[in-house]
Amino acid sequence: MIKAVMMMNTQGKPRLAKFYDYLPVEKQQELIRGVFSVLCSRPENVSNFLEIESLFGPDSRLVYKHYATLYFVLVFDGSENELAMLDLIQVLVETLDKCFSNVCELDIVFNYSKMHAVLDEIVFGGQVLETSSAEVMKAVEEISKLEAASNSISLVPKSVSGWRGR
């Protein structure tokens, strides 16, 4: 099971953090700080896989990938394959690149609802749902269409809404 998905910049600011087990906000912040301190102290020429039992408990592992100014991090238990989790980060990044045409930190900050939609199509409740970037894109585009359609529907007749503006 996946325990957490995090995206943070190289200064340690979390840009997206999703925990699949309930944790109080203070504990989440403590874990994010702990993960960042581990990541920023690692040289570039070492493995992207870590045992992280000291932070997340027994049988916890972490895999990360560093792209430009962002760390993409997955924390998971022993039931998940480490290479599959690394590939899942790649799927997430490829999908985000398709959504935002070369994703950057600002895309994550200003499009958080779309970010969560993409992540929820890939991982939900700590379980991997989809590993195809194309399928995730189809689902996200459908969600965007439905949101656009629901935004264009007005529940208040124009005659009444015109009256409210006076």
Curated annotation (Swiss-Prot):
UniProt-annotated location(s): Cytoplasm; Golgi apparatus; Cytoplasmic vesicle membrane
The answer, when asked if Metal-binding is one of the entry's keywords, is no
Q: What happens when the gene is disrupted?
A: No obvious phenotype.
Q: Which UniProt keywords apply?
A: Cytoplasm, Cytoplasmic vesicle, Golgi apparatus, Membrane, Protein transport, Transport
The source's domain of life comes to Eukaryota
What membrane topology does this protein have? Peripheral membrane protein
Signal sequence region = none
* InterPro entries, A to Z: AP_complex_ssu, AP_mu_sigma_su, APS3, Clathrin_sm-chain_CS, Longin-like_dom_sf
- Would you tell me the Gene Ontology cellular component terms? AP-3 adaptor complex; cytoplasmic vesicle membrane; Golgi apparatus
Biological processes, Gene Ontology terms: Golgi to vacuole transport; intracellular protein transport
Presence of the UniProt keyword Cytoplasm in the record:
yes
Q: How does it assemble?
A: Adaptor protein complex 3 (AP-3) is a heterotetramer composed of two large adaptins (delta-type subunit and beta-type subunit), a medium adaptin (mu-type subunit) and a small adaptin (sigma-type subunit).
Hey, which family's this protein in?
Belongs to the adaptor complexes small subunit family.
Q: According to its UniProt entry, what is the function of this protein?
A: Part of the AP-3 complex, an adaptor-related complex which seems to be clathrin-associated. The complex is associated with the Golgi region as well as more peripheral structures. It facilitates the budding of vesicles from the Golgi membrane and may be directly involved in trafficking to the vacuole. It also function in maintaining the identity of lytic vacuoles and in regulating the transition between storage and lytic vacuoles.
- Please identify the protein, giving its name as recorded: AP-3 complex subunit sigma
- Recorded source organism is Arabidopsis thaliana
Q: Taxonomic lineage per UniProt?
A: Eukaryota, Viridiplantae, Streptophyta, Embryophyta, Tracheophyta
